[in-house]
């Protein structure tokens, strides 16, 4: 099947006159000097290698029942890692892990919890039903966690000086159990934060981090489809069963994290004699103060604990010109959720779209770029990460122990949940608006005949939930390649509708399986974009930098002072 794009004057897969113009623009926006202009002949070779047949074969294998959902620490994940290594070697990549192999060891702890949650309020005892009304997990590798604490509603649980927002008001919260709203106040008031575009302060991970900083015993996150941006079924499937942590994390006072349904939260608050809706409305104001509910929660979590090692699979394409050890990193996670609760008689969470598709794109990009020859100035590292679904753990391990100093990483480009629905006329690259990579993103999109689309669902906070994010927090500029919305030969709203159907019916469910009807023209577009991005960045002599108003600007300045 030919490499297809939307209607455009650029020939797909080769550098036409439009492509040469795009390269010229790329040189301008990256600050590359004349001697670092990408070799257009080499780029043509790279773009010509990937095929829909090989992409289909990768997805079909990685999403097969044989691999049992590729959960970290399982035989299926080990098979997937070996498969990726073999494809890297076949392409001609060299080992890229710090120890000189293809495998970066990631030491993990798996905790499988069996929790109970009882709330005492106004002489009434409420026993919440596991999975139906709550899920909970220990924050450390503990076989037994028992926590008993007073429940305090802390609104959105945010302390953000840059936004002049503090939900805590210096309230002493040591040993308390915090009841929190998910997302941030911009969800309901477009005049605060980034409006409906979720900030990191709106993510569940930030809220647990902040609760730990304040010495809380636990955190109860209130789920709604709107605020979490996914249904309760995703919570059930993602936070039940084995929960994985990096071995050796610093112990913290926060004993547990939990999600509860809004219905359960309403019952608790109502029993305490408080108007739930009024309380939530007040939480959207800067003058909000924590509300003590005169209620106690007792949680008991007995867990099975196992320690194991998983791997990031890392291959590198070495430059023969650069002498500063600078690199460009391309990522896609290969793990998924393994075997879990059966739905419609199927208990294998195959993860075809999430993220066998992204790994297929990474492998196709690697094969193409390897055929192009040595990159002009920077080496290119291809990183298939483990344990993304458990909290970006593989990417975090890479950041903690990188093959080169972090300051030598020019940029990271991530592919997660690739487009298997067909060609588009536009493309999403999350993070483009945050750094000078934005101009490069526009240029390479134009070279593929595509329009660069802003995040169509900023309220979901997708930027904070995939493997590029640990790079951004460390100060490295990033791009997250997403799926466009304007599909060729489809009705105008088809892309949005298909995304909603996927999230409701397949995301983190056994039904995310290989489909012989997948259409790979869109994924081929993403491979071409990743190829162009990587090759151009590898040819540049300057570092991308964060924009002045980007929340990662300070991290970037700490990483590379003076740039």
Language model segments and positions:
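Bacterial N-terminal signal peptides
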Residues: 17-30
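Soluble metallo-hydrolase cores and metallopeptidase-like ectodomains found primarily
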Residues: 38-43, 122, 129-170, 250-351, ...
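Catalytic-core environment of secreted peptidases
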Residues: 49-96, 118-122, 172, 176-201, ...
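Extracellular/luminal Protease-associated
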Residues: 51, 129-249, 253-256, 318, ...
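Noncatalytic luminal/extracellular "stalk/propeptide" segments of secretory-pathway proteins
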Residues: 68-191, 293, 305, 309-312, ...
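Metal-dependent peptidase/peptidase-like ectodomains
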Residues: 128-132, 142-144, 169, 246-276, ...
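Acidic/histidine-rich catalytic neighborhood of metal-dependent amide-processing enzymes
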Residues: 196-202, 206, 210, 227, ...
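His/Asp/Glu-rich mid-to-C-terminal helical/loop segments that flank catalytic regions of hydrolases
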Residues: 367, 371, 485-556, 560
């Amino acid at each position: 099947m030919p490499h297809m794009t939307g209607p455009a004057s650029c020939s797909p897969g080769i550098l036409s006159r439009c492509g040469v113009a795009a390269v010229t623009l790329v040189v301008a926006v990256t600050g590359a000097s004349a001697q670092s202009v990408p070799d257009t002949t080499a780029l043509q070779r790279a773009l010509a290698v990937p095929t829909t047949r090989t992409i289909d074969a990768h997805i079909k294998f990685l999403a097969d029942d044989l691999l049992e959902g590729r959960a970290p620490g399982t035989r299926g994940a080990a098979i997937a890692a070996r498969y990726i290594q073999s494809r890297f070697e076949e392409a001609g990549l060299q080992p890229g892990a710090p120890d000189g192999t293809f495998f970066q060891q990631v030491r993990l702890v798996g905790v499988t919890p069996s929790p109970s949650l009882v709330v005492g309020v106004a002489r009434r005892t409420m026993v919440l039903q596991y999975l139906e009304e709550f899920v909970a997990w220990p924050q450390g590798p503990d076989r037994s966690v028992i926590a008993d604490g007073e429940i305090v509603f802390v609104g959105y649980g945010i302390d953000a000086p840059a936004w002049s927002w503090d939900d805590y008001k210096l309230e002493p919260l040591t040993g308390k159990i915090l009841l929190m709203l998910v997302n941030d106040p911009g969800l309901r008031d477009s005049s605060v934060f980034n409006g409906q575009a979720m900030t990191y302060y709106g993510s569940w991970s930030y809220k647990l981090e902040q609760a730990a900083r304040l010495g809380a015993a636990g955190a109860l996150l209130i789920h709604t489809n709107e605020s979490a941006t996914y249904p309760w079924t995703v919570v059930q499937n993602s936070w039940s069963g084995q929960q994985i942590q990096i071995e050796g994390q610093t112990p913290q006072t926060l004993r547990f994290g939990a999600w509860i349904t809004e219905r359960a939260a309403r019952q608790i608050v109502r029993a305490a004699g408080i108007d739930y809706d009024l309380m939530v409305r007040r939480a959207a104001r800067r003058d909000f103060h924590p509300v003590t509910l005169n209620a106690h929660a007792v949680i008991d979590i007995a867990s099975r604990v196992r320690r194991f090692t998983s791997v990031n699979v890392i291959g590198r394409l070495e430059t023969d010109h650069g002498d500063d050890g600078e690199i460009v990193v391309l990522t896609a996670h290969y793990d998924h959720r393994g075997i879990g609760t059966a739905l419609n008689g199927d208990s294998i969470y195959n993860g075809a779209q999430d993220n066998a598709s992204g790994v297929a794109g990474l492998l196709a990009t690697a094969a193409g770029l390897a055929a192009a020859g040595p990159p002009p100035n920077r080496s290119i590292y291809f990183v298939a990460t483990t344990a993304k679904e458990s909290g970006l753990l593989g990417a975090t391990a890479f950041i903690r122990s990188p093959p080169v100093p972090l300051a030598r990483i020019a940029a990271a480009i991530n592919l997660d949940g690739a487009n298997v629905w067909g060609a588009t006329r536009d493309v999403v690259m999350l993070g483009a608006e945050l750094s000078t990579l934005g101009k490069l993103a526009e240029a390479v999109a134009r070279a593929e005949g595509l329009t660069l689309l802003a995040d169509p669902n900023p309220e979901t906070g997708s930027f904070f939930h995939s493997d590029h994010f640990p790079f951004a927090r460390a100060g490295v500029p990033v791009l997250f390649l997403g799926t466009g919305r304007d599909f060729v030969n489809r009705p105008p709203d088809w892309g949005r509708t298909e995304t909603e159907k996927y999230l409701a019916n397949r995301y983190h469910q056994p039904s995310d399986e290989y489909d012989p009807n997948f259409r790979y023209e869109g994924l081929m577009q993403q491979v071409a974009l990743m190829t162009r991005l990587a090759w151009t960045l590898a040819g540049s002599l300057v570092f991308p930098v964060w924009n002045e108003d980007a929340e990662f600007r300070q991290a970037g300045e700490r990483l590379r002072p003076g740039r």
